[in-house]
Amino acid sequence: MRKLFLLSILMIGVIVAFAGCVEESKTTTQLQQTTQSESQKAETQPKLGVNVVRYAETFKLYPHWDEGYCVVADSVGNKFVLVEGNAKAPNISDGKIIKVPVKRIVTDFYCPIISAADILNAYHHTIVGAPKYAVEKSPKLKELFDEGKVVDIGSPSKGVNYELIVNLTPDIVFLGDWKSEDVVEEKLKELGVTVSRFYTYQEPTYMGRVEWIKFAAAFWGSNAYKKADKWFENVVKVRENILKKVQNVTNEPTVVIFSWSKTKNMPGIYGNDSYYSKMIAEFKGKNVFDDYNRGYQYVDKETFYERAMNADVVILIWFYGDVKTKEDLLKINPNFAEFKAFKTGRFYVSHPDYYVWEARDPAGYMMDFAKMIHPELFGGDDDLKYYYKIK
């Protein structure tokens, strides 16, 4: 009886061990199949490669033009696979395939799409819709507008004509970073329209903002991209030459850069997070508001006057009209007469269309800043292109 009992226990142990081996074998097989499946999936998902963006932080770019495509990721992570000609589209997960060069573009701002077309002096015919104010900043696009080939789509702040946009059958619509544009994006997606977001004004550096030309040009194909890349490298060289000239500066002038609100009647300053402040620091100037971390913010007049009154250089960003003389400037605020920079001839005011040229001619725009901060190193400040020296 005892032997029978022991034999039964032994048989049960063998059965359990066998079952365990079977289950382990099954699990191993499943794991191998899963690993193989993931491996096969990885093989069908081409590697994006290297993000070639050098300065910008709000978009990514993976060019594979030799294989007929380029992958871009916009400011909110939307991924687009730009396929040229008859090239085979790669299988990029969550990537929207778009044939390039695109034929029908809608944009709600001047930069970076319209500015890129102006810089490259081409591709305006692909822009079929834009706000009228942006159209008027581009001579060629204005010409097409007058011919009825470009239409005014409205603007996020005043209202967008959704029906008109849909009827334009755009390949893609480009929107900026305003909160009102979040609503526009949601509505357009509901209508089945492809949308991309560009946060150019959130770039922490000026060169990062300028580099967006590569993003825009990629939608027009490899030739446009290569021209944009070459143009950008020339801008890089201008910046490097400026940095070389100021590298030995030890006496940094104090600088104020601000705007003045006509509606609020108060100053708004550009703090340490703005690309203006970073450019001033690079060119060996000292922004007196660099302890304000936000890019742009309003400050009370008392605080502003306390810091700005004795600054060596004062730069006013102004878009309400031309301000060329002391008389023009004092109409904005008579207290400016007490500023040190006003008395010494170091008070400067932007042209009202400055934002067009900081996108279209960054080399000239940077040189203006270099001359305003260190005129002694750059041949004086009497020949500025996009700022008025107040006299």
Swiss-Prot record:
Keywords associated with the record: Cell membrane, Lipoprotein, Membrane, Signal
Principal localisation: membrane
Residues carrying lipid (S-archaeol cysteine): C21
PROSITE patterns, per the entry: FE_B12_PBP, PROKAR_LIPOPROTEIN
Signal sequence range: 1-20
Record localization: Cell membrane
Topological type in the membrane: Lipid-anchor
Record bears the keyword Signal: yes
A GO CC term attached to the entry: plasma membrane
CDD domains, A to Z: TroA_d
Coiled coil: none
Domain of life, source organism: Archaea
A Pfam family it matches: Peripla_BP_2
Sequence ranges assigned to domain Fe/B12 periplasmic-binding in this UniProt record: 104-377
Entry-linked PANTHER family: MOLYBDATE-BINDING PROTEIN MOLA, VITAMIN B12-BINDING PROTEIN
Protein name, UniProt field: Uncharacterized lipoprotein MJ0872
